[in-house]
């Protein structure tokens, strides 16, 4: 009978630890989402710096391919709309200005964890944010 009591005690402790740890698992997606949004914000700042460098050296702003070919961004940004950490980036660039958007996207290999949409342009390099739709200059500053 003693072994039965020990077994019951150990089983109860294991069950209690499993149920308490499942509460912590709910926080994990939020932490990952915050991390992915932080990565996206830093990426937008890096893109703005790369655009300034491209304009200074080549006389105009450029798209992701121009920025990567010039060596100002790494190859993760190759293509018209690269997808990094659950965000799809897009650039509209001309000789005199550029606009960058980063919007949450889901792919087979990268599920969306961030929820906010981000915008940055060449006029002031300030990041604007919108929680429901693609951000624009009219949205609040981050």
Question: What do the predicted segments below correspond to?
Answer:
Residues 1-7:
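Bacterial N-terminal signal peptides that target proteins for export
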Residues 19-22:
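Bacterial signal peptide processing site
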Residues 14-17:
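C-terminal motif of bacterial Sec signal peptides marking the signal peptidase cleavage site
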Residues 26-30, 49-114, 122-123, 140-142:
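Extracellular/periplasmic head regions of type IV pilus-like filament subunits
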Residues 131-142:
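Short, low-complexity, Pro/Ser/Thr/Gly-rich segments in the mature regions of secreted, periplasmic
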Residues 12, 123-127:
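Short secondary-structure subsegments characteristic of cysteine-rich extracellular domains
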């Amino acid at each position: 009978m003693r072994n039965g009591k020990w077994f019951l005690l150990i089983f109860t402790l294991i069950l209690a630890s499993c149920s308490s740890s499942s509460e912590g698992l709910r926080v994990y997606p939020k932490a990952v989402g915050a991390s992915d949004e932080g990565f996206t914000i830093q990426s937008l700042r890096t893109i703005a710096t790369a655009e300034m460098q491209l304009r200074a050296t080549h006389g105009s702003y450029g798209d992701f391919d121009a920025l990567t070919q010039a060596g100002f961004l790494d190859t993760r940004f190759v293509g018209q709309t690269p997808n990094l950490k659950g965000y799809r980036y897009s650039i509209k660039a001309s000789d005199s200005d550029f606009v960058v958007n980063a919007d949450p996207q889901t792919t087979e290999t990268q599920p969306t964890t961030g929820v906010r949409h981000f915008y940055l342009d060449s006029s002031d390099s300030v990041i604007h944010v919108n929680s429901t739709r693609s951000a624009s200059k009219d949205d609040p500053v981050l």
